[in-house]
Each structure stands twice: as structure tokens, then as C-alpha cells.
């Protein structure tokens, strides 16, 4: 690696909105950042995710507008 061209690599403290704090190394240039979601509060990782059923919307659309295309 060339000397003097790489950014400084420092420890960064991340604080989540749920209160979880952790440190990681980065060339970000800041000493702390605020996160909205982390692995401790994200629904995918906590097992509290909801599955959104969009089939009802398609059925409603077909009921409202499906007959328009079949008229001749």
C-alpha cells in the first residue's frame, strides 16, 4: 500500500434509537453516529416481523376494473 494516501481508520461509537450502543472501526471521519434501527430492534432479527398480504389489493383491483377489459 502507498504511504499517506489512505484515510485514517478510527473507532466509531454507534448509538441506536432503542438505546443499544456498539463500536466499530471505520474511515467515516466521525467519532459517533446515530442509527434508527440495529440488529437488536429490527423486526427481521427479533422475529417480530409482519408479512404484508398484498393479495387483497390485487383482488380488489380485479373486482373493480377486471370487467372493463372483458367487455366487447
Curated annotation (Swiss-Prot):
Gene Ontology CC annotation, any one: ribosome
Cofactor (UniProt): Zn(2+)
Residues at which Zn(2+) binds: 16, 18, 38, 41
GO molecular function list: metal ion binding; rRNA binding; structural constituent of ribosome
The record's free-text note on cofactor binding: Binds 1 zinc ion per subunit.
Keywords, alphabetical: Metal-binding, Ribonucleoprotein, Ribosomal protein, RNA-binding, rRNA-binding, Zinc
GO biological processes: translation
Assembly: Part of the 50S ribosomal subunit.
NCBIfam families (alphabetical): L31, PRK00019.1, PRK00528.1
Family named by the database record: Belongs to the bacterial ribosomal protein bL31 family. Type A subfamily.
Protein name per the record: Large ribosomal subunit protein bL31
Taxonomic source organism: Aliivibrio fischeri (strain ATCC 700601 / ES114)
Taxonomic classification: Bacteria, Pseudomonadati, Pseudomonadota, Gammaproteobacteria, Vibrionales
Amino acid at each position: 500500500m502507498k504511504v499517506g494516501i489512505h484515510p485514517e481508520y478510527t473507532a466509531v461509537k454507534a448509538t441506536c434509537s432503542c438505546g443499544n450502543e456498539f463500536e466499530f472501526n471505520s474511515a467515516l471521519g466521525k467519532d459517533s453516529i446515530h442509527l434508527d434501527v440495529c440488529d437488536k430492534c429490527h423486526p427481521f432479527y427479533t422475529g417480530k416481523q409482519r408479512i404484508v398480504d398484498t393479495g387483497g389489493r390485487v383482488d380488489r383491483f380485479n373486482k373493480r376494473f377486471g370487467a372493463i377489459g372483458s367487455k366487447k
